[in-house]
């Protein structure tokens, strides 16, 4: 069983959703971003790590600021791999899902990129701009190396398309809860999100389905019926605030992750 599936199995026995954190590799520095990962892993179940990108189409202002800081610090794709490798070596490591855009993979070539991911210990991949069914070949290549390719579904995904995506998905499916960039205010009520979520879940009760976009300390408890919840913008915002106030982002971000974990435990 994959580490991602094991993480979901563990939280089910604890009768709570998995907490997935998202941070940008290299924010605020390469060293600090590794320290943040090691620290938040005490309370997170799965760690999503974003490739900093100069035009991240799906990312809201907070994540764009994080990506900008990382790029300004000269972070390269090889540095992202090095952060993952060092994190996976640590005692408190958790399953890692890398999230990015296809042009970065294209520079390396699919097979080369997937081989490096395997070597450094990546458990899953989300490629934001490689939708289904165009991603089928790439997903197959990932599966061959025991890397989970994570499909995305949204409120506008048709039922027929949704069925196919869920059928072909690997360890989990990422449900984008609302049509906006990440970190937007929750324009849809948690009740409505869970209604839609329930319809997706009915298609395959055994599939792990996580909710992302708009999840904060205020909204997380009301969504705890989901298999997993992804929090990213709130963490990136805390890194920005810590830098502005000249405080240690490691401590501040960890405190937020601990609070989030308590709200769903």
Curated annotation (Swiss-Prot):
Entry-linked Pfam families: Trp_syntA
Catalytic residue list: 48 (proton acceptor), 59 (proton acceptor)
InterPro entries on file: Aldolase_TIM, RibuloseP-bd_barrel, Trp_synthase_suA
Keywords from the UniProt entry: Amino-acid biosynthesis, Aromatic amino acid biosynthesis, Lyase, Tryptophan biosynthesis
Gene Ontology MF terms: tryptophan synthase activity
EC numbers, comma separated: 4.2.1.20
CDD domains: Tryptophan_synthase_alpha
Coiled coil (UniProt feature): none
Recorded catalytic activity of this chain's protein: (1S,2R)-1-C-(indol-3-yl)glycerol 3-phosphate + L-serine = D-glyceraldehyde 3-phosphate + L-tryptophan + H2O
Pathway info: Amino-acid biosynthesis; L-tryptophan biosynthesis; L-tryptophan from chorismate: step 5/5
Enzyme class: lyase
CC annotations in GO: cytosol
Subunit note: Tetramer of two alpha and two beta chains.
Family from the record: Belongs to the TrpA family.
Classification via HAMAP family: Trp_synth_alpha
Known function: The alpha subunit is responsible for the aldol cleavage of indoleglycerol phosphate to indole and glyceraldehyde 3-phosphate.
Name of the protein: Tryptophan synthase alpha chain
Lineage: Bacteria, Pseudomonadati, Pseudomonadota, Alphaproteobacteria, Candidatus Pelagibacterales
Gene name of the record: trpA
